[in-house]
Amino acid sequence: MIDSAAKENTITPIMSLETEEALNSGGKSCEEQKCKKNATANIKVVENEDSEARLGQTPSGQIFVLPHDPPNRRSILETVDFRVPKTPWDLVVDGVILAQVLLFFVTSGMVRRFLMLGCFFFWRVSYDAGIGYLLHKQSHQQKIVDWIVGMGFFDKTNHPKLYEMTKRQLKAKMDSSYDFENSPVEFNAWLVFRHFVDLVLMCDFCSYVLMACAWLCWPKMNFFAHILRIGAGYLLLVFNLWVKMDAHRVVRDYAWYWGDFFFRLRGTLVFNGVFELAPHPMYSIGYAGYYGMSLITGSYMVLFASIVAHMAQFAFLLFVENPHIARTYGSDSSKAKEFLPHDLVNEPLLPAQKDTVVFFNFDITRVSDVGLALLSVYSIVLVLFTPNSNYARALAVGQAFIWRVAHSLLHGFILSRQSKTKAWTRHFISRGNSALDAWAQWKGLYNLTLCMSYITFIMASWKMYSFPTNWIYGSAFFRHVLGLTFIALHIYTSVSIFDDLGNFGWFYGDFFLPVQSPKLSYRGIYRYLNNPERFFGSAAFWGMALISNSSWIFFLALLAQVSTLGIIRFVEKPHMQRIYGSGLRKEAGVEKTIKQATLKSNITIPTALKQRVKTITSTIDKVIDQTAGAVEEFLDTAGPKVHELLHDTSAHIRYQAQLSVLKVLDPHTKQLGLSNYGLEVDDLSDRKIPFGAPIRVKWNAPANHSTHDWIGLYRVGDNPSTSVTQTSSQGRWSAVQPDVYSSHSKSIEYLSPNKDSGVVCFSDDLLFWKPGMYEFRYHHSKNHVVMTRSQPFEIVLSRCDSVVYEDILTALKPIISACLPGVDLEDSKLPLEDISTDQAKRIVLAIRYAFKLSFEHRVVKVDGKVSVLARRISKAKKILQSFSDSFSAEKKTA
C-alpha cells in the first residue's frame, strides 16, 4: 500500500508521506557532515482541535468536507472481520479467499506447492503491475475517475441499478456523515477504487500465507538452531504487524489507499510514529514479515519468492509513486542543499567543475582521474590475470589490506589535524594556493584512496571466492542472499548519504571551508540515524565476506568496520561538537521511536539496572577518550622527543670530548685568567633588540690571548654548560682579529692597537631570524672553551593580529626593511623578484612569527611586491579567521 500521507498547512494542499519523505531528503556535514546532515519525520493528518471536520480539495479546486474517520478504524480488516456486517463486495472478497484455501486443501505435494506459488505471484502482479498501472494513468490523466464515471457507477439516469448498488456499498463502508450525492466525483471514485484494492491486498496476503505453508519444510540442523530460526521468524512477524498498524495509525485510509492521486487533504502535520524509524517504512521494514515467514518455513523457495515480491514493491515505489511525487509537487526541493561556505575573500564559493565521486563525473583530461583509472586497472589486472595460487591470493589480500590502512590513516590523520589546526589548508596557503585549492586536493586524494580500498577489497574477495558445488544444501544460498542484501543496503546507504549531503558533505567540506551558519538540518536517512555510515556504511564488506566465506575477507571487513568506527568516534564526532555544539541532536528517529514504543507498552527498566548500564557506558567512554588522548599525545610528542633525545645524545658526546680538551687546556686558561675577558652588547638598555637589527658586541681579552679566539651567537638554553659550548653556531660566529679566519673577519668593525679589545657587528647571515632569548660566547682559540658570556638579550618582533590590508602593510614594511637592508620603506611596490633565496626565507620566517602564517619562500618572489604580499597575508588571515568566527558564533549561541 501507499507509503504516503500529506503535507499540509492551512492554505496549501497536503502531499503524501512518500512525497514529504522525498522532498525532505536533501541536503555529510559536514558525518554528522561525513556537514554531514538532515532530518524531518514523516507525517500524519490530524483533525483540528476545535473542529472534527477535515477538508479536501479536488484537482479542479473544489473544497469539500470529508466524512468522519475514526482514528482506530482498520477498514481493510473489516472485510474478514466476522463481527462486522458484510456487504456484497465483502462476500466476493471472502469468497475468493476461501476458494484459494479450498484449493490448498484439495491439492497436495508439488502440485499444491507450485499452484500456491502461482496464486501468490498472480496477486502480487495484480498489486504491483495492476494497481501500479491504474495509479500511473490516474496520476497522468485522471483515468480511474474517467473509467469509473464512464462505466456508470455514478449515473443515476442511465444505470440506476449500478448507481444504487454503488451508493449502498459506499454508504455501508462509511460513517453516517458521508453524503454520497454531494461528495465530489473524485472522492467517490476513490472509494470505489478502494474496494478493488481491498480485493487485491487481502488475496495477496492470504495467497502468500498459503504458499508459505505449502513449502513448509524441516531443514537438517540442531534443535537450538531450530529454536533460534523459528523464534526470530515470529519476532519479525510481530514487528511487521506493529509496523503496519502504526503506519495506518499515522497515515489513515487517505494515504493507505493512495488518496493524493485523487484529491488533496488539508490539515495540520504531526511528525511521529514508524515513519521516524526507517525510510519508506511501508515498503522497507513493512515487509519484514516476508523474511520472518521464510525463517519459519525453512524454505529457500519461500525466501526466493519473498525477495522477488519485495523487489517488485520497490519497483512500484520507483516507477509509480516517486514520479507522481515529482510531477505533482516538483523535485527541486528534493535535491541536496549545498552548505555554502562563508565569503572566501573574493574567491568563487564553489568550483564550477564537477568533482569525481567514485567514478561518476570521470574526466579523462583530469590528472587525478587518470591516476585513479590507472591504479584501478593495475589492481584489477593483478588479480584477474594471475593464477589462483596461494601467492596470488596473498597478494590480493595484501594490497586490499594496504589500501584499507592507507585510506583509514590518511583519512583520520588529515581530517584530525585539519579540524584542530587547519594544517591541510595552511599547507596550501603557505604555497600560494587558496582554501578551495586545499579542499580540491583533499577531494582528489580522498576519492582515490576510497575507490582503491573498495576495488582491492572486491578483488581480494573474488580471489578468495569458490563457486558452490551445491546451492540447495548447506548455507551457500543463504550466504549469497544475505551477502547481496548487505551489499544492496550499503549501496542504498551511500547513495542516500550523498543525496542528503551533496558534494560539500560527502567530501567533509565543513572541515575545509566555513559554512554559512553552523546549524544542522536532519533530513533523508539522517532523520532516522545520526551516523548511518557507522554500521550500514560497512555492510558491503560483510556481505562480500559472507559470499566469499573466507576468514581473510572477514578480517578485512572487520578492519574496515573498526577503522570506520574509529574515524567517526575520534575525528568526526569531536569536530561536530566543536562546530555545532548544542545544535547536535540528542536522539535519532530510530532511538526516539523505540523509546516511545517502550513507554507506550509500559515497559520499565529497573533504576538500578539503568544506573549500572550508565556507569559501564561512561566508564567505557572514559577509557576510550583517555586511550585516544594518550595515543594522540604520543603522536604529537614522539617526533620532538626523538629529536630532543638525539640532540642531547650528540651534545653529551661532544661535551665529553670537550671536557677532555678542557682538562688539557686548563693550565693555560688559568694562566690567562677568565676575569680578564669581557663581552658586552652595545646599546642594550632594556635587553631587547629589534628583529633583524645589527648587533654590535664589545670584547676585551688579555694581551696574550690567542689570535684564533672567536665569538659565537647562541640561543639561551641550548648550552647548559657555562664553561663549554655544546652546540654548533651554524655559521653565526665572528673572528676577533682579521686575517685569521678570512671567511668570518668582515664583521670586525674595530680592533685596538694592542689587539686586546674590539668591536664586532653581527648582521645578515650571522643573526638568528627568530624571536627569542640569545647570548654571545667568547671562545678560546680553535675550540669551544668558553672564556666569557654576554648578558642574555631578547630579539623581539611585534605581532599583527589585524586582517585589514593597511594594518598588515604597515606592519610588513619594517620586516622587509630588516630582512632587506637599504630598501625604501615608503615604496609599497618595492620589487622582490630579485632577492636571494636566503632573504626570502627570512621574510617568510618573520611572517610566521608576526602574522602566524606559514608561506613557502617562493611565494615572496612570485608576489614580487610588498603590497601584493600584504594582500596575500590579509586574504589568508581572513580565510583562517572565518573558521574561528564560525566556531565562536556557535559557542555564543550554545
Swiss-Prot record:
Similarity section: Belongs to the class VI-like SAM-binding methyltransferase superfamily. CHO2 family.
Organism: Schizosaccharomyces japonicus (strain yFS275 / FY16936)
EC number: 2.1.1.17
Ranges facing Lumenal side: 1-90, 135-195, 244-268, 321-366, 416-447, 492-538
Catalytic activity field: a 1,2-diacyl-sn-glycero-3-phosphoethanolamine + S-adenosyl-L-methionine = a 1,2-diacyl-sn-glycero-3-phospho-N-methylethanolamine + S-adenosyl-L-homocysteine + H(+)
Gene: cho2
Name of this protein: Phosphatidylethanolamine N-methyltransferase
PANTHER family recorded: PHOSPHATIDYLETHANOLAMINE N-METHYLTRANSFERASE (PTHR32138:SF0)
Tagged with keyword Cell inner membrane: no
Alphabetical keyword list: Endoplasmic reticulum, Lipid biosynthesis, Lipid metabolism, Membrane, Methyltransferase, Phospholipid biosynthesis, Phospholipid metabolism, S-adenosyl-L-methionine, Transferase, Transmembrane, Transmembrane helix
